[in-house]
């Protein structure tokens, strides 16, 4: 759906794709090599560089729909102001109201990509602050350790 959108922005995909059969299957089907906006940049192992890519991205697009707390989503919330998430329970639980959600209905993501380009910077900054607050309040090591201490102390008293 990105390729059918009118956005002038690039879609930067950070992944090890070169030897992937799936990459070649999808490329044969969608011909994304013909869209100059689609950029596969490979895997980035340099943490500082990856943080810089996330921080300077216009938005983070998260299409995972299988359960649990996804580390890449947590990292994005901590560094990217505009986070576009597939609308499933796991993602909603993590992002709450700090993210914008899209569905799997035809053209839903396409329209969202075009719509978010109309957001003013103050709104994007507000979402970014909410995302960073969400990470700090629910997923920081301080919070996690405190929750485990409480759990273990309650178990000890039983």
Model-derived regions: residue spans:
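Short hydrophobic beta-strand element within catalytic cores of glycosyltransferases
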Residues: 78, 82-85
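Short acidic/histidine- and often glycine-rich active-site loop of Leloir-type glycosyltransferases
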Residues: 88-101
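A charged, aromatic-enriched C-terminal amphipathic alpha-helix characteristic of glycosyltransferases
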Residues: 125-153
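Short hydrophobic signal-anchor/transmembrane segments that target glycosyltransferases
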Residues: 1-9
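Short glycine/serine-rich donor-binding loops of glycosyltransferases
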Residues: 70-73
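Acidic donor-binding loop of glycosyltransferase active sites
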Residues: 52-68, 81
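Conserved acidic donor-binding segment of nucleotide-sugar-dependent glycosyltransferases
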Residues: 99-107, 115-121
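Glycosyltransferase donor-sugar binding loop
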Residues: 10-25, 39-43
């Amino acid at each position: 759906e990105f390729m059918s959108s009118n956005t002038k922005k690039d879609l930067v995909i950070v992944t090890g794709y070169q030897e992937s059969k799936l990459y070649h299957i999808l490329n044969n089907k969608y011909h994304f090599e013909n869209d100059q906006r689609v950029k596969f940049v490979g895997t980035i192992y340099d943490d500082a560089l990856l943080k810089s890519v996330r921080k300077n991205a216009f938005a983070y697009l998260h299409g995972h729909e299988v359960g649990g707390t996804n580390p890449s989503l947590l990292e994005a919330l901590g560094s990217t102001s505009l986070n576009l998430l597939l609308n499933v329970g796991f993602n909603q639980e993590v992002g709450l109201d700090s993210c914008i959600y899209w569905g799997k209905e035809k053209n839903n993501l396409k329209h969202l990509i075009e719509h978010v380009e109309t957001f003013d910077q103050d709104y994007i900054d507000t979402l970014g602050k909410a995302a960073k607050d969400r990470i700090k309040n629910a997923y920081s090591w301080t919070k996690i350790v405190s929750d485990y201490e409480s759990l273990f102390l309650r178990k000890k008293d039983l």
